[in-house]
Structures are given as structure tokens and as C-alpha cells.
Design a protein with these regions (language model features):
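A small-residue-enriched
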Residues: 20-43, 74-131, 234-243, 270-338, ...
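Alpha-helical heptad-repeat coiled-coil segments that mediate oligomerization/polymerization in large
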Residues: 205, 361, 368, 404-408
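Short segments within alpha-helical structural elements
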Residues: 189, 218-245, 353, 358, ...
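Terminal intrinsically disordered/low-complexity segments used for targeting and assembly
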Residues: 1-75, 227-272, 440-467
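Short, Lys/Arg-rich amphipathic alpha-helical interaction segments
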Residues: 126-133, 137-143
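Periplasmic alpha-helical coiled-coil/stalk elements that build and connect Gram-negative outer-membrane
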Residues: 20, 135-137, 151-272, 368-371, ...
Length: 467
């Protein structure tokens, strides 16, 4: 009975190891479950030429109509090759986890010895018993690593969706702003041409004419910058959507969506972020995995090589010999202290990283929500106060012009001012939708938040260019 214990224990370990195999495609389903609530379309992985052709046909169909924000996200998740490459990491890690759960291959040795006329043949079959006994623990560690990779890939999916939505907002706003900058340039050109003709007729002095010419030059510069921003925003959107060739002729809506009636009120936003942010979950899993790695290091600290073998010797002059042998590593020079110290430091490092991730998550979501509320208030102020006021001023100026109380130059200058206010309103609406995308991302993962000072300087420069 004692002889049967070792084979039975090895058989039990083998059964446990066989149960630890990973079902192909299970990781993709897990990523889908993590992202489906935040990205409506389901993820697909292109593994063949037929899959690529099917994706291309789907994208072509979606591009027949002007691209909305949700459609842009759908195309990006379907067609972005960088995301497809990242999704392949799931299959790679699944294969590595399955490989780690497999039984170690046994070793075989053969020897031939001669002594006079005697020939002795030695055959041995051995297996790494230390690796076999730690196989369940190693399999659980690999499964934890697979879960971490799943969350990392899910984070990449959500980041791409947020970036595509923000790029769409910027592209539509840049297109709408370019249209108004054309109006500013046309008004400035008409004013400059009228000033030139009136100077030729002797009704204008050189200073007034040069002033109008300066307005026209500034408007032309503002138009060139608007065209540059529009091209850059469109190209960035095309990159994120994975578009090229004939697909670059995609159409966008004429304007951004209207401002919502009221902003979202989220008093428990920090708790919500900590509960559902994937980077916080990944940091927690990393700390747990490091703790299990520390346990494995402690188990194998002194003996990391422990082999059991069966031996069979035959000779032409002696009876056959059978038996077993055990070989193990003697910890004479390396007691495993350095590996244990490294594992402990890695564990403490993972704890600090998890705490830092949670602290940063709280701060990011507070900042994102503050930007969201401030951007909403600014956009609403433009919509309800500044734009109607500029429109009323323009109406009064037109009445004064019809009554010959002001001249055409004052009317054109007021038209430029009104268009500039509308353009500023577009930028405020753009900033709101960008802030909303940042807030949505900050609730589920790392968000790329803008620098308020830089944004303010840029807005001021654009407004000045329009006058």
C-alpha cells in the first residue's frame, strides 16, 4: 500500500492541472463583459482574410452616412488595427496559461557501461517532482495574470472608444468653426475692398484704409489656422478609426449636438469610480498576485530542484536491477535569501502602487467632474447670454445702418464680432462634450485630462484672430 501513495498523489495533481486549462475565446468574452456597458458594439477579432473582408464591408456600410459619435466609436472598435493587435494578446496569454498548467515532460536517460566482457545497460525515467507539486499554485498565478491582462485589454478598448469620441467632437467642431471663419474672412475682404475703392475716390484716408486691410490680413491668418486645425482633427479621427484610401472621404455632421438641459449630478462620484475603475481593479489584482508569488518563493526557497526517477539496469552477466532515485538541489551557496527579499520588495511595491492608483483615481474623477460642470456653465452662458446679446446688438446696428446713422464699415465690423462670438460658443460647446467624454472615462479608467491654463490661452488666441 505504501508504494501506491506516490502514484496516486501524482495522478491527483495531474487531474487538477488538467482542470486548469483555459477555454479558447473565454478571455475575449470576459473583455466584452467588462466593456459592453460602456461601448455598445460587441468586440470582434479578425483572425482570417474572411474576417477582414467582413469588417471592411461593415465599415464601408457605416461610412455611407455622416458619422455620428456612436458610429465613430463602433468603427474604431471594428477597424483599428492597433486594437486588433492588442486583442491578440488575449490569445497569447491564454496559450501561456494553458502551457503553465500542463504536466512537465519526463526525462529519460540511457547509459552503456562495459567491464571486460560484461556489458551493463542503464535506463532511467525521471520527473521534476518540485515542479509537479507546485503546479496547482503556478496555475492559479497564471490565471491571475490572465485576469490582469483581460483588464488591461479592456482598458485599452475603453481608452480607444473615449479617444474616438473626443476626436469626433474635435473634428466636427473644427469643421463648424472653419465655416464661420470663412464668413469672417469674406466680411473682412469686402470691408478691405470697399476701403480701397473709397480711398481711390478720395473719400477715405490712408490710415482708415490700412486699418481695414489689417483686419483682412488677420482674418486670412485666422482662416489658415482654422483650416490647419480642421485638417489635423480630421486626420486624427481617421487614424483612430483605421481609415485609409477611399474611406478618407467620410462625411461628418454639420454641427455638434445641442447642450443638455441640465448637467449630471453625481455626489458619490468617488465611490462610484473606485468601485468600477478597471485600473483600480488591476492594481488590486496585481497586489494579490504578488502576494501569491511571495508564497511560491517561500515554498521553493531552499529546494527548487527535486526530481524523482525510476532506474532499470540490465547486464549480460548479472540479474536485472530495478529501483528508484531522488535528486535534489543542495542549498550550499544559495539559500534563496535574495529571491525572498526581492519577492517581499515586489509585494510592498505592489501595495504602494495600488494605493497610489486609488488616490489618483479619486483626484482624477474629482477634476473631471469639476471640468464637466464648469464647461457646462460656460457653454450655457455662451448660449443663453453672449450669443443672444450679440445678435440683439447686430439687429440694432442694422437698424442704425438703415437709418444712415452708421456706415457700412461699422456694420461689417459688427458682423465680424458676431461671427467671432458664435465661434467662441462653438468652442465652448466642444469643450463641454470633451469634458463629458473625460468624465465618462475617469469613471471607468485612466483619463487624459486637459491643462486648463493652456486651453484658456488657446481660446483667447483664436478669439483674437477672428477680430
Amino acid at each position: 500500500m505504501k508504494r501506491s501513495r506516490l502514484p496516486l498523489s501524482l495522478l491527483a495533481v495531474a487531474m487538477l492541472a488538467g482542470c486548469a486549462s483555459v477555454e479558447p475565446g473565454a478571455s475575449l468574452n470576459q473583455v466584452r463583459s467588462l466593456t459592453q456597458a460602456h461601448t455598445a458594439p460587441a468586440l470582434t477579432v479578425d483572425r482570417s482574410a474572411e474576417d477582414l473582408a467582413r469588417t471592411h464591408a461593415k465599415v464601408t456600410e457605416l461610412l455611407r452616412q455622416p458619422i455620428g459619435a456612436d458610429t465613430a466609436v463602433q468603427i474604431a472598435l471594428l477597424n483599428n488595427r492597433g486594437l486588433q493587435a492588442r486583442l491578440q494578446q488575449l490569445g497569447i496569454t491564454e496559450a501561456e496559461v494553458s502551457q503553465a498548467a500542463r504536466l512537465p515532460n519526463p526525462g529519460f536517460s540511457f547509459g552503456r557501461l562495459t567491464q571486460g566482457d560484461e556489458i551493463e545497460l542503464e535506463r532511467a525515467l525521471h520527473v521534476n517532482l518540485a515542479r509537479l507539486l507546485t503546479l496547482p499554485l503556478v496555475s492559479r498565478l497564471e490565471e491571475r495574470r490572465l485576469q490582469a491582462v483581460q483588464r488591461e485589454v479592456a482598458m485599452d478598448v475603453l481608452s480607444l472608444a473615449a479617444d474616438a469620441r473626443k476626436a469626433w467632437v474635435q473634428a466636427v467642431a473644427a469643421r463648424e468653426s472653419l465655416r464661420y471663419m470663412h464668413q469672417v474672412q469674406e466680411a473682412a475682404e469686402a470691408s478691405a475692398e470697399l476701403a480701397r475703392r473709397m480711398q481711390q475716390a478720395g473719400n477715405f484716408n490712408a490710415l482708415t484704409r490700412l486699418r481695414e486691410q489689417g483686419f483682412y490680413a488677420d482674418a486670412a491668418l485666422g482662416l489658415a489656422r482654422a483650416e490647419q486645425r480642421q485638417r489635423a482633427a480630421r486626420e486624427r479621427l481617421a487614424r483612430l478609426l483605421g481609415l485609409w484610401g477611399d474611406q478618407l472621404d467620410f462625411k461628418l455632421p454639420e454641427r455638434l449636438p445641442d447642450l443638455p438641459d441640465a448637467p449630471r449630478d453625481q455626489p458619490d462620484i468617488e465611490r462610484q469610480a473606485l468601485a468600477q475603475r478597471l485600473d483600480v481593479q488591476a492594481a488590486r489584482l496585481a497586489a494579490e498576485q504578488t502576494a501569491r508569488n511571495l508564497r511560491l518563493t517561500e515554498v521553493t526557497r531552499f529546494v527548487s530542484v527535486f526530481e524523482l526517477g525510476l532506474v532499470r539496469n540490465t547486464s549480460n552477466e548479472a540479474p536485472r536491477q530495478t529501483g528508484w532515485e531522488v535528486s535534489l538541489e543542495l542549498p550550499l551557496f544559495d539559500w534563496g535569501g535574495a529571491r525572498a527579499a526581492k519577492a517581499e520588495s515586489l509585494y510592498m511595491q505592489s501595495l504602494h502602487q495600488a494605493a497610489a492608483t486609488a488616490i489618483n483615481a479619486r483626484s482624477e474623477v474629482r477634476e473631471a467632474y469639476g471640468n464637466y460642470r464648469a464647461s457646462y456653465d460656460i457653454a450655457r452662458h455662451h448660449r443663453d447670454e453672449i450669443v443672444p446679446l450679440r445678435k440683439r446688438i447686430s439687429e440694432e446696428q442694422l437698424l442704425r445702418y438703415n437709418g444712415m446713422l452708421i456706415g457700412v464699415f461699422e456694420l461689417l465690423a459688427d458682423a465680424r464680432s458676431q461671427v467671432a462670438s458664435v465661434n467662441a460658443s462653438i468652442e465652448a460647446l466642444r469643450d463641454f462634450w470633451l469634458a463629458k467624454a473625460d468624465l465618462d472615462m475617469a469613471l471607468i479608467g485612466r483619463a487624459t485630462l486637459p491643462m486648463p491654463a493652456a486651453a484658456a490661452v488657446s481660446a483667447g488666441g483664436e478669439a483674437g484672430a477672428g477680430h
